[in-house]
Structures are given as structure tokens and as C-alpha cells.
Amino acid sequence: MRYLVTLRVVSQPGGPPPADLMEAIAKLGQEAAETGALLDQSGLAPSSEGARIEVSGGRLTVTDGPFAEAKEMISYALYEVRTKEEAVEWASRFLKLHRDLWPGWEGEAEVLRLFGPGDFAPPA
């Protein structure tokens, strides 16, 4: 099963992430890739560089960022694992690195299962 993990920052100390955190993230990503669990990952640009498209009342509206949410989405990872618990474990390890190596950083991850065409096939 494929899972999308998104990371949102709630608050963080000023300045860039510590070098030891970035090194630990790279090692965790390498480990996940070597096991075949990690399919893709990347940081995300601030919402000020994005857009939101909405359909409401039959109208399509495009709004340029930034968006008012207090929690900025900053990265994602795409995993291929056997269970939701495995995806949660990878996401937890990622967040633990932030907790342990960047004092004062606060954030959250969402783990969402992806559907494919086979999930919508008619019953045999």
C-alpha cells in the first residue's frame, strides 16, 4: 500500500534547521529508500509561492498564496509499505529527529493512504 506523509510546522526557532538534523534526515531517507519503503520525498516551498483552486457554487476560483492557516506544510514523503502502522513508524521516526535535534521545533505529520485504479474496480 502507498501512503503519503505530509509534514506541517506549528512553530520553529528562527534560522535554518540545524546541520545535524539535516544529516540525520538524509540518513533516515537513505535507510527508507534502501528498504524499498521510500518512493519519493521533498521539501515544499512556502504557500506564498503556491495557489489554491476551489469549486464552490458552480464557480472555479483561484487564489494565490500565502494562505491563512497557522500550520505551513513544509514537506512530504511517499512510502510503499505493508501496513498503515509501518507508514506511521517512518513518520514518527522523522518527527523524533526534529524533536531531538531541533529544540523548540513543533509540528505534525499526517499519514494518508493513496488509492489506485484497482481500489475502484467493480467486484468480480
Region roles according to the model:
Residues 1-124:
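Conserved, structured core segments of small domains
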